[in-house]
Amino acid sequence: MHLELASCKSMKGVSIMNDQRIFDMELVKVESLENAVRTPFYQTDSTGGSVWVIKPGQTLPKHYHHNSDDIWVILQGKGVFYPTPDTEVTFTKGQVIVSKKGECHGAKNTGTEDVIFVSIVAPVPADYDPVSTN
Protein backbone atom coordinates (compact mmCIF):
# COMPACT_ATOMS: atom_id res chain seq x y z
CA MET A 1 0.00 0.00 0.00
CA HIS A 2 1.35 3.39 -0.96
CA LEU A 3 0.83 6.41 1.28
CA GLU A 4 1.04 9.92 -0.03
CA LEU A 5 2.70 12.78 1.78
CA ALA A 6 1.50 16.12 0.50
CA SER A 7 4.20 18.66 -0.17
CA CYS A 8 4.11 22.13 1.32
CA LYS A 9 3.47 23.48 -2.19
CA SER A 10 0.20 21.54 -2.42
CA MET A 11 -1.16 22.88 0.86
CA LYS A 12 -2.71 25.98 -0.67
CA GLY A 13 -0.15 28.39 0.74
CA VAL A 14 0.20 26.87 4.21
CA SER A 15 3.76 26.25 5.37
CA ILE A 16 4.87 24.24 8.39
CA MET A 17 7.90 26.47 8.81
CA ASN A 18 6.21 29.64 10.02
CA ASP A 19 4.88 31.13 13.24
CA GLN A 20 1.23 30.38 12.46
CA ARG A 21 -0.71 29.03 15.45
CA ILE A 22 -4.26 28.68 14.07
CA PHE A 23 -4.89 26.37 11.10
CA ASP A 24 -7.99 25.95 8.91
CA MET A 25 -8.22 22.25 8.06
CA GLU A 26 -10.20 23.03 4.88
CA LEU A 27 -7.16 24.93 3.60
CA VAL A 28 -4.61 22.39 4.85
CA LYS A 29 -6.09 19.04 3.79
CA VAL A 30 -5.09 17.39 0.53
CA GLU A 31 -7.00 14.49 -1.06
CA SER A 32 -6.15 11.64 -3.43
CA LEU A 33 -8.47 9.20 -5.17
CA GLU A 34 -5.72 6.56 -4.98
CA ASN A 35 -4.32 6.64 -1.43
CA ALA A 36 -4.72 8.00 2.07
CA VAL A 37 -2.87 11.34 2.28
CA ARG A 38 -1.01 12.86 5.24
CA THR A 39 -0.42 16.60 5.07
CA PRO A 40 1.91 18.03 7.74
CA PHE A 41 0.84 21.48 8.91
CA TYR A 42 2.90 22.01 12.07
CA GLN A 43 6.22 20.88 13.49
CA THR A 44 8.53 21.90 16.32
CA ASP A 45 11.60 20.10 17.64
CA SER A 46 9.29 18.00 19.85
CA THR A 47 5.81 17.72 18.24
CA GLY A 48 4.32 17.30 14.77
CA GLY A 49 0.79 17.87 13.50
CA SER A 50 -0.72 16.46 10.31
CA VAL A 51 -4.16 16.19 8.78
CA TRP A 52 -5.12 12.90 7.15
CA VAL A 53 -7.76 12.35 4.45
CA ILE A 54 -8.90 8.77 3.85
CA LYS A 55 -11.48 8.36 1.09
CA PRO A 56 -14.23 5.69 1.32
CA GLY A 57 -12.67 2.24 0.95
CA GLN A 58 -9.10 3.50 1.47
CA THR A 59 -6.85 2.22 4.24
CA LEU A 60 -4.13 3.76 6.36
CA PRO A 61 -1.99 0.62 6.80
CA LYS A 62 -1.36 -0.83 10.23
CA HIS A 63 1.96 0.37 11.64
CA TYR A 64 3.99 1.25 14.72
CA HIS A 65 5.98 4.23 15.95
CA HIS A 66 8.55 2.76 18.34
CA ASN A 67 9.50 6.07 19.96
CA SER A 68 6.43 8.31 19.52
CA ASP A 69 2.84 8.57 20.71
CA ASP A 70 0.22 9.29 18.01
CA ILE A 71 -3.08 10.98 18.92
CA TRP A 72 -5.88 11.17 16.33
CA VAL A 73 -8.79 13.62 16.61
CA ILE A 74 -11.53 12.44 14.24
CA LEU A 75 -13.12 15.47 12.54
CA GLN A 76 -15.28 13.70 9.94
CA GLY A 77 -16.36 10.25 8.82
CA LYS A 78 -16.39 6.78 10.29
CA GLY A 79 -14.37 3.64 9.94
CA VAL A 80 -12.46 0.94 11.73
CA PHE A 81 -9.32 1.41 13.82
CA TYR A 82 -6.73 -1.35 14.24
CA PRO A 83 -5.43 -1.35 17.85
CA THR A 84 -3.72 -4.68 17.13
CA PRO A 85 -2.92 -6.35 13.81
CA ASP A 86 -5.97 -8.65 14.20
CA THR A 87 -8.52 -6.37 15.92
CA GLU A 88 -11.00 -3.86 14.45
CA VAL A 89 -12.79 -1.21 16.54
CA THR A 90 -15.29 1.20 14.98
CA PHE A 91 -14.78 4.95 15.28
CA THR A 92 -16.73 8.02 14.23
CA LYS A 93 -16.34 11.80 14.15
CA GLY A 94 -15.88 13.49 17.49
CA GLN A 95 -13.77 10.70 18.95
CA VAL A 96 -10.10 10.78 19.96
CA ILE A 97 -7.83 7.75 19.42
CA VAL A 98 -4.61 7.45 21.43
CA SER A 99 -1.77 5.13 20.41
CA LYS A 100 1.20 5.07 22.76
CA LYS A 101 4.69 4.39 21.42
CA GLY A 102 5.04 0.80 20.29
CA GLU A 103 1.28 0.23 19.88
CA CYS A 104 -0.18 -0.90 16.56
CA HIS A 105 -2.50 1.52 14.79
CA GLY A 106 -4.09 1.97 11.38
CA ALA A 107 -7.52 2.68 9.94
CA LYS A 108 -9.95 1.94 7.13
CA ASN A 109 -12.73 4.21 5.91
CA THR A 110 -15.91 2.11 5.94
CA GLY A 111 -18.29 5.02 5.41
CA THR A 112 -19.55 7.03 2.45
CA GLU A 113 -17.73 10.30 3.21
CA ASP A 114 -14.06 11.10 3.67
CA VAL A 115 -12.48 10.31 7.03
CA ILE A 116 -10.57 13.41 8.11
CA PHE A 117 -8.50 13.47 11.27
CA VAL A 118 -5.74 15.46 12.88
CA SER A 119 -2.72 13.47 14.04
CA ILE A 120 -0.44 14.83 16.76
CA VAL A 121 2.84 12.91 17.12
CA ALA A 122 5.48 13.35 19.82
CA PRO A 123 8.37 13.19 20.02
CA VAL A 124 9.49 13.81 16.45
CA PRO A 125 10.83 12.64 14.17
CA ALA A 126 8.58 9.59 14.37
CA ASP A 127 9.68 6.34 12.81
CA TYR A 128 7.23 4.32 10.67
CA ASP A 129 7.34 0.54 10.96
CA PRO A 130 4.63 -1.22 8.91
CA VAL A 131 2.97 -4.33 10.31
CA SER A 132 4.20 -7.29 8.29
CA THR A 133 1.55 -9.09 6.27
CA ASN A 134 2.89 -12.65 6.32
Predicted ranges, named:
Residues 50-65:
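Conserved short histidine dyad/triad with adjacent acidic residue
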Residues 2-48, 61, 98, 130-134:
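A short, N-terminal "cap"/entry segment at the start of jelly-roll beta-barrel domains
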